[in-house]
Amino acid sequence: MKIVLLGPPGAGKGTQAKSISNKYSIPHISTGDIFRKNISENTPLGIEAKGYIDNGQLVPDEVTINMVKDRLQQDDCKVGYLLDGFPRTVAQADALNNFLVDKNEQLDTALLIKVPNEFILERMTGRRVCPSCGASYHVKFNPPTNEGKCDLCGSEVIQRKDDTVETVKERLDVYQKETQPLIEFYGEKGLLSEVDGTKAINEVFRGICELLGNNK
């Protein structure tokens, strides 16, 4: 089973990706992990990517695509895989499609975890973390017993910079611009599947399993 996972920041993609990977015995392939591995191992592609990053430039599609292609040709991908963070652009989606066509293979589905912006804002901006022990809370869904204080060590909990309203809105804007064309791309190919990401984690996963069925 070959799956592309789509969804906004804060949609719970990481949690669901792990569950999908375990249930269907396919590797969860994160673009971030691929980049880190290539850079840490000083592969030719990693060195090239690091050069762009160090200069404050975006890594070109060609480099990213080649990294992903290399990963998809490893033995553990023979039974399928779950792609998370790739493709991000229609050009990358086209490249993935061409790669699969050349191998006489095809994508099974592009799975979109749908969550409204207002829900994401509430979920992400309400997150709090203890800077001392790392415990995490949510002002609405999982508040500390003593308001503003960590239950474990008593330190004052804080909001991370990534979770401010301004930052979350910026990330959602970027996601919308990047992903809407992808949603249309996969929709036109009849490959788009959607699941309601506002439900409880186990309910979202149940919905995903219903969409994916027992295929492997």
Curated annotation (Swiss-Prot):
Q: What is its EC number?
A: 2.7.4.3
Cross-referenced Gene3D superfamilies, in alphabetical order?
P-loop containing nucleotide triphosphate hydrolases (3.40.50.300)
Coiled-coil blocks: none
Residues annotated as signal peptide: none
Where AMP is bound, by residue?
A: 31, 36, 57-59, 85-88, 92, 160, 171
Subcellular location as annotated: Cytoplasm
Q: Give a yes or no for keyword Transport in this entry.
A: no
**Where in this protein does the record put region LID?**
126-163
Assembly and partners are described as: Monomer.
HAMAP family attached to this UniProt entry: Adenylate_kinase_Adk
Recorded family membership: Belongs to the adenylate kinase family.
Give the protein's biological function: Catalyzes the reversible transfer of the terminal phosphate group between ATP and AMP. Plays an important role in cellular energy homeostasis and in adenine nucleotide metabolism.
Q: What is this protein called?
A: Adenylate kinase
Q: What is the lineage of its organism?
A: Bacteria, Bacillati, Bacillota, Clostridia, Eubacteriales
User: Quick one: which gene encodes this?
Assistant: adk
